[in-house]
Curated annotation (Swiss-Prot):
Name of the protein: UDP-N-acetylglucosamine--N-acetylmuramyl-(pentapeptide) pyrophosphoryl-undecaprenol N-acetylglucosamine transferase
HAMAP family assigned to the protein according to its UniProt record, in alphabetical order: MurG
Residues reported to bind UDP-N-acetyl-alpha-D-glucosamine: T17, G18, G19, N128, R169, S195, Q297
Record GO terms (molecular function): UDP-N-acetyl-D-glucosamine:N-acetylmuramoyl-L-alanyl-D-glutamyl-meso-2,6-diaminopimelyl-D-alanyl-D-alanine-diphosphoundecaprenol 4-beta-N-acetylglucosaminlytransferase activity; undecaprenyldiphospho-muramoylpentapeptide beta-N-acetylglucosaminyltransferase activity
Pathway: Cell wall biogenesis; peptidoglycan biosynthesis
Biological-process GO terms, alphabetical: carbohydrate metabolic process; cell division; cell wall organization; lipid glycosylation; peptidoglycan biosynthetic process; regulation of cell shape
Family annotation (Gene3D superfamilies): Glycogen Phosphorylase B
Enzyme Commission number: 2.4.1.227
Keyword terms of this UniProt record: Cell cycle, Cell division, Cell inner membrane, Cell membrane, Cell shape, Cell wall biogenesis/degradation, Glycosyltransferase, Membrane, Peptidoglycan synthesis, Transferase
Any matching Pfam family: Glyco_tran_28_C
Length: 366
């Protein structure tokens, strides 16, 4: 049912967090550079990340994630999902896409279901090292399942699978050209909790640095940290009382520059974060989100820990003392830091968006 016009359309279906939206955006940028029209289907949460998403049109549809532990909520969720599928079908009949690209998250379900029913080719991109629930349901029906990491758990047998990496934004790729900073002066620590912030990182990391890094090293530190607004005052007071230069914000709009300036990054291990660390080439300490579905953040972290580019501390083990000792060990050895940066860079896949776009075009032409 592809459009017979000169410009083909790809509809992008993505969930309601930055982890799904950012790679979808990088893919959309690449497809538009190749002359394609792009459209975005998501729910209200997803569209909050899409103010400047490169799309000819964007559509908010009904979506839900049924909670079978609360069976009384399932009928309402089913009604929302069916309404979303019906709306997605109408849109596809109207706009006649050549392809639907799913980037995971439950808001992607209605568009993928509609595409399957209408016979529109489907490609799926899985950012994490564990295939998500929505992508899992459509993997065997997709012409391609592209993955962000070599490891991809829970992939159904018979699925067409290819490792391409996670598409990252052009400014991140540009930051990857910045050399690792010298380690004989100020040491920059960049601390981020991902697109939704992290209360635990905001509590534990400042205590680790202020109380468990020795003064001779502590005076050389500059800390740049993403914190929630309600934590701003307490974190600021803690750093300043310990004599540590700090810069705090709820969100950093210049993330590529912050990563490039860092000697050490402390972060969650969402797929986007891990891929950006590799692209820029910076050593890290990763604290996976314990409640992540299928423990996928711990699986993601292994892409860097296995090659000596990162350390991983599970939330259950993340005490200020342990973290402070690890920070001290890493920052005290400049040669080791530099080697870890090079190891991270070796895992980079800066051409992921191009590879995914190439496969999308091939599949659309079949």
């Amino acid at each position: 049912m592809a459009d017979t016009g000169t410009e083909k359309l790809v509809i992008i279906a993505a969930g309601g967090t930055g982890g799904h939206m950012f790679p979808a955006r990088a893919f959309a940028d690449e497809m538009r550079a190749r002359g394609w029209n792009t459209a975005l289907i998501s729910d209200s949460r997803g569209l909050r990340y899409a103010a400047d998403f490169p799309a000819d049109w964007k559509e908010e549809i009904e979506a839900a994630s049924p909670n079978f532990r609360k069976p009384w909520t399932v009928p309402g969720a089913a009604l929302k999902i069916n309404a979303g599928i019906a709306r997605a079908r109408r849109l596809m009949k109207q706009h006649r896409p050549a392809l639907v690209a799913g980037f995971g998250g439950y808001p992607a379900f209605p568009a993928l279901a509609a595409a399957r029913r209408l016979g529109v080719p489907i490609i799926i991109h899985e950012q994490n090292a564990v295939l998500g629930r929505v992508n899992r349901q459509f993997a065997k029906h997709a012409q391609l399942v592209a993955s962000g990491f070599e490891r991809l758990d829970r992939l159904p047998r018979g699925s067409a699978h290819m490792v391409i990496g996670n598409p990252v934004r052009a400014p991140i790729i540009a930051a990857g050209q910045v050399p690792f900073p010298p380690t004989d002066g100020t040491l920059n620590i960049f601390i981020t909790g991902g697109s939704q912030g992290s209360r635990i990182i905001g509590e534990i990391v400042p205590l680790a640095i202020a109380n468990h890094v020795a003064p001779p090293l502590r005076v050389r530190l500059k800390v740049v940290q993403q914190v929630r607004e309600e934590q701003f005052e307490s974190v600021s007071n803690l750093y300043r009382s310990a004599g540590i230069e700090c810069e705090l914000a709820a969100f950093f709009g210049d993330m590529p520059e912050r990563l490039a300036a860092a000697h050490l990054v402390i972060a969650r291990s969402g797929a986007g974060t891990v891929s950006e660390l590799a692209t820029v080439g910076r050593p890290s300490i990763l604290i996976p989100l314990a409640i992540a579905m299928d423990d996928h953040q711990a699986a993601n972290a292994e892409a860097l820990t296995a090659i000596g580019a990162a350390d991983m501390i599970l939330e259950t083990n993340a005490t200020p003392k342990l973290l402070g000792e690890l920070i001290s060990a890493r920052l005290s050895d400049g040669a080791d830091l530099t080697a870890r940066a090079a190891a991270a860079k070796s895992a980079a896949r800066p051409d992921a968006a191009q590879k995914l776009a190439e496969m999308a075009e091939r599949i659309a032409e079949l």
